[in-house]
Amino acid sequence: EADSTTTAVKETYGQMILTDEGIVANTYYYSTSCGVGTTASIWKTVEAQMLDYLKSSRLSQSPENPVQTDDGAVAAGSTEITAETTAEELSEEESFRDFITQTHAEDYEAQEGWYRWTYTVKEIDVDRILETLKNRYEANGKLILTLKDGDYSSQNIKNFSKVTDITIVKRGPGGVADELVIATDKGTYKIISEYNIRAVLCDGVTRVVRQDGSEVSMPSLLPSAFFVIEPSHDKKNMIGYNIIGGGFGHGVGMSQNGAKNMALQGLGAEQILNFFYEG
């Protein structure tokens, strides 16, 4: 138990975050952002439609637009905390690729290990992908679709022995991968939702390399769905893929490391909470 956390708890004891309707808000959080968050729409649930206070925002600071801290001082190199974001721009493939393949010194978490990472699969595990597709289909068949007669629909997954291509075809707010298409020798499948995408592309063996050089095992899920994928081919078939990504977690609500670094810049609890739960 640290003195700083004890103090924070005591100073905010009894405070609540309410929606515009006066209802206690669901304060979702995750570990680390890649410099931008997303919205609850990525979960494809009915409840997500009621969580409009969870915005997709850039977690960055700019010396051109400083913010005052609780004691009236200006936090060096910080930006006014507003609802302005680049989320719409980052939902475009080219813009997101430019964003995620670079680091941005103004981002609050630019020095965190999970801020950027790579995941290089040298030999694709087709059986693992097939098994995961079937498991995710059993969990929710509406989010694992099969291409038939030009349209995607929910159908049982057929066995296949080769993967010919993998492509992100849709991004959600902030650039998170929202729909992935996997082409095989027996059919083409669309995987919907960040969780399913993270599960399907994780082979359980390859280690994630964080930007600080440390390696981490990921047995069942990629760290996040904020990534771009670069397939490697041998003639007509995929033999592997390289992923360049950032962040750890789903990206909805408050980034814990983002909040930590905001506090280190001198921002107070109310300012930080108003940023992440602005709506």
Ranges and model annotations:
Residues 1-279:
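Conserved, single-site charged/polar hotspot
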